[in-house]
Structures are given as structure tokens and as C-alpha cells.
Amino acid sequence: MGSSRVIRHQASNYAQSAYQCHIKEPLLSLFGNEKQHSSGTTAAAAITFPQKLIIDQLTRKRKTKKKKIRKLGLHTSVFFFLRIVCMSSAASVFTGIRCVFMFRTNAK
């Protein structure tokens, strides 16, 4: 278990490196308007978005966990977050969310 600061730093580094590798131009939306690339991968990255947006997206299909998520105190200032969707695997749609969110939940 790491501190939430360390986890945010790791998430930021992951988002930045994936952004540099896969995205050639800025993306304006977190979950929409993805750019499709020749590799068959779509990627979306969001920088500096509010806590409510994070909560809404994380709880879109899991309404029962909304109170638990609110208790985490996710940062409202700057938070780097990345979702990579592999077109060949529907199961990987929320992989990025689950990985980052799992570490953030366990951080004390």
C-alpha cells in the first residue's frame, strides 16, 4: 500500500507516458470523442477535471458504491486519468479505471 500522493504520481506518469506514445493531439473528453488510431486502439485522457466528474463516471454502472467513492476524498485540483480502450477486447474498456481506482481505494 502506498500513500495517495504516490498513487496519484504513478497515475500521472502512466497517463503522460501513454499520452505521449498513443495520442498525437489533445483530447477534449474523458469518455467520449475518442480518436481511433491505425493500431486499432482508441485512447482518451483527461487533465484537470473536477471530482464530481470522476464520481459520476466511476458510478455510472455501480450506483451502490457512490457513497464509498465520495468518502475517498478524490482530489479536485489536478488529477491525471487515462482510459485506453482496446477495440478487440470489450472487457478492457474499464481496465484503466479499475487499476487506478483499486490502488487509490487501498491507499491510506
UniProtKB/Swiss-Prot annotation:
It is a single-pass membrane protein. GO terms for cellular component: membrane. Keywords: Membrane, Transmembrane, Transmembrane helix. It is found in: Membrane. The chain crosses the membrane at residues 72-94. This is Uncharacterized protein YLR296W. It comes from Saccharomyces cerevisiae (strain ATCC 204508 / S288c). The lineage of its organism: Eukaryota, Fungi, Dikarya, Ascomycota, Saccharomycotina.
